[in-house]
């Protein structure tokens, strides 16, 4: 299989503005693996987003062994008017899937989507309109996080991953008033020109996660803008269980650390909060075997964290009118996010770069 190899571009080259025709051609790229539950809904939400003659959807599948490929095939048959392509991704990682799909894309504009995402009916059209204004290199819309299952824990997870106490200031996931555009560090499901992707050398395939933040960091390092527009949105289905959530955030933290090692200037102080919390727990707990005063210091730290988690759990569930069960579960979900992300971030800092 041919592939696009990431190459380090000159991040300081002069920025170029892009003016697009109203109906620029669009290619939607969806990396996926074993997504039989969600891929059909994602395709259904994307099918009528844009004039079919200027539009294609490319599903880059990591050799799924469930019914994902069958669902895509059935959708192709039921929508003969729409160009839907299914490409194989034996590498089974997201940055490779994106590079491979974009290299094969025919569109001037690339829309990076996810099998867990359900964009509003005007998502693609609105992104193209904003790009066409020539004021931004990358455009995205807010995510409305939905439960990944009809269970109390899934509802609690959906609340946690869209709450500032859970995930910090990821603005594309946080509720905001008004329809104003905003400059941001990154967006979840970005639209950008294929020429920009080429100029940047593609997505960095050394980063198996966090490749989108890295891409947008390199865009901003060129002096160009990443804009969050709020006139459309995308529903995103969160992980349904604590085990899957922990696995997701363990992966996020580890690869965030790897990105920071490669690009130290991308570090934000807020990204050190969870690792510092985990490190302090570990150090105080270990030191307590030698000096009991360390355990005495650990107790108020954990009590303060628990109090904050309970406070924000009550606040969030009351605001969203969630049941009492969600409020009881939220502190455990918050801790799962912070401990998984913080632990894996520290692990990513100390392990060799070649270790996956």
What is each PLM-predicted segment?
Residues 10-13, 35-48:
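Short, well-formed alpha-helical segments that are part of the catalytic scaffolds
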Residues 21, 44-54:
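Short, acidic, metal-binding catalytic loop of nucleotide-sugar glycosyltransferases
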Residues 24-27, 56, 214:
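Cell-envelope/extracellular polymer assembly enzymes that use nucleotide-activated donors
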Residues 45, 61-70, 91, 114-120:
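A conserved acidic beta->alpha catalytic loop
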Residues 89-105, 125-126:
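Glycine-rich, basic loop-to-helix element that forms the pyrophosphate-binding segment
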Residues 110:
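Short aromatic/hydrophobic "clamp" motif used to bind/position activated sugar donors
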Residues 118-155, 159-161, 237:
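Conserved donor NDP-sugar-binding/catalytic core segment of glycosyltransferases
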Residues 147, 204-267:
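Catalytic donor/gating beta->alpha subdomain of glycosyltransferases that bind UDP-sugars
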């Amino acid at each position: 299989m041919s592939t696009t190899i990431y190459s380090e571009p000159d991040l300081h080259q002069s920025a170029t503005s892009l003016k697009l025709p109203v109906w620029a051609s669009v290619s939607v790229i969806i990396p996926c693996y074993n997504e039989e539950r969600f891929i059909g809904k994602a395709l259904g939400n994307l099918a009528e987003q844009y004039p079919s003659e200027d539009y294609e959807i490319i599903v880059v599948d990591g050799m799924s062994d469930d019914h994902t490929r069958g669902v895509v095939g059935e959708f192709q048959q039921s929508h003969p008017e729409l160009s839907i392509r299914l490409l194989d991704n034996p590498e089974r990682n997201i940055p490779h899937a994106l590079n491979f799909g974009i290299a094969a894309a025919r569109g001037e504009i690339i829309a990076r989507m996810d099998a867990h995402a359900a964009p509003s009916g005007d998502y693609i059209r609105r992104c193209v309109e904003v790009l066409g204004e020539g004021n931004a290199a990358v455009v995205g819309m807010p995510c409305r996080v939905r439960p990944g299952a009809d269970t109390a824990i899934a509802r609690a997870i959906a609340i946690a991953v869209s709450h500032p106490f859970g995930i910090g200031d990821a603005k594309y996931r946080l509720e905001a008033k008004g329809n104003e555009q905003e400059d941001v560090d990154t967006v979840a499901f970005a639209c950008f020109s294929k020429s920009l992707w080429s100029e940047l050398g593609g997505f960095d395939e050394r980063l198996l996660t966090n490749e989108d933040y890295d891409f947008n960091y390199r865009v901003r390092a060129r002096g160009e803008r990443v804009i969050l527009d709020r006139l459309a949105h995308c529903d995103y289905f969160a992980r349904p269980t604590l085990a899957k959530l922990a696995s997701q955030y363990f992966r996020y933290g580890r690869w965030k650390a790897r990105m920071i090692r490669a690009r130290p200037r991308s570090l934000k102080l807020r990204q050190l909060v969870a690792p510092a919390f985990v490190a302090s727990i570990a150090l105080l707990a270990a030191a307590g075997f030698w000096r009991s005063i360390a355990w005495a210091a650990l107790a108020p730290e954990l009590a303060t964290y628990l109090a904050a988690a309970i406070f924000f759990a009550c606040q969030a569930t009351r605001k969203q009118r969630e049941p009492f069960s969600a409020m009881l579960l939220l502190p455990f979900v918050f801790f799962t996010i912070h401990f998984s992300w913080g632990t894996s971030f520290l692990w990513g800092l100390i392990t060799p770069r070649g270790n996956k």
